[in-house]
């Protein structure tokens, strides 16, 4: 805290007015001290509110993050959480997905909070995903115009998500205020709703610092914010099954199931001089899955129906989706997995598909 400003020399007051002069000077000094201290205290409160014993100081805090109006609140992600590998992976996966969707628009997003806050990119993203056209101005520079565009875009998002029970954990002010947590909640919900061909890391949780200004002072608190749970829960499509239990509570039994499935698939793929040692990776492109179904049902799959040597994500998804169609044709139920999950090396999804085949064809020679 800075000291009080030096006082200029003043003539000695007559003795009879000593008390009055002393109190007057003291009052002036205290007033100057108070004013200086208020400025310094506000800066120090901002620093101490953001820093906490459980986390290092935020070195990239913007000045505006500690300049709040009375009763105003601002949130920011704890720096430790920003460095968490799963958080970084979530941000990267979402960035890559957005850029892939908007590739034809020649839009490249480099930083979520800086590139999405004004509604321009969100508008284009929603129009692409929902195959619609929003009635908004193409370019808006003013804050009012940006918020009006955001309002229109978020209302369209709400119309899509709310009927399906998605919690809306964002609003115009949080998105326009570059609140990364709110932006991530929005993007995760969109990715799940539109079944994006991506694999979001599960159980991503961040610590959020909430700073509020009350009676001229800044107060902070930490809250835990869950950004993702599991794919099944976020999709809201599947009930827990035996594989959830195996993965969560019985890894030893899970290994036995994997060995049994490897034995089962090799029993048939060996007829084509093919052998599987890793279920997670060797079924990811869909080729072995298609060939296995042909062997199990004793038919030849025309090569023009699938990609024998797929070299892109879309071709692999096509192969797995085609295999799912063959399963339906064979009288099996639709697998409790998405083709994208199998392609993205989600072991649980791959095991579910193979176990479905095992239960029907385990006695086939």
Curated annotation (Swiss-Prot):
One record GO biological process: cell projection assembly
Description of post-translational modifications: Phosphorylated by ILK.
Location of the Calponin-homology (CH) domain: 88-195, 255-362
Comp. bias regions, Pro residues: 1-12
PROSITE patterns named in the record: CH (PS50021)
CDD domains with a match to the protein in the record: CH_PARVB_rpt1
Keyword terms of this UniProt record: Actin-binding, Cell adhesion, Cell junction, Cell membrane, Cell projection, Cytoplasm, Cytoskeleton, Membrane, Phosphoprotein, Repeat
Function (record text): Adapter protein that plays a role in integrin signaling via ILK and in activation of the GTPases CDC42 and RAC1 by guanine exchange factors, such as ARHGEF6. Is involved in the reorganization of the actin cytoskeleton and formation of lamellipodia. Plays a role in cell adhesion, cell spreading, establishment or maintenance of cell polarity, and cell migration.
Family, as annotated: Belongs to the parvin family.
Record protein name field: Beta-parvin
Species: Mus musculus
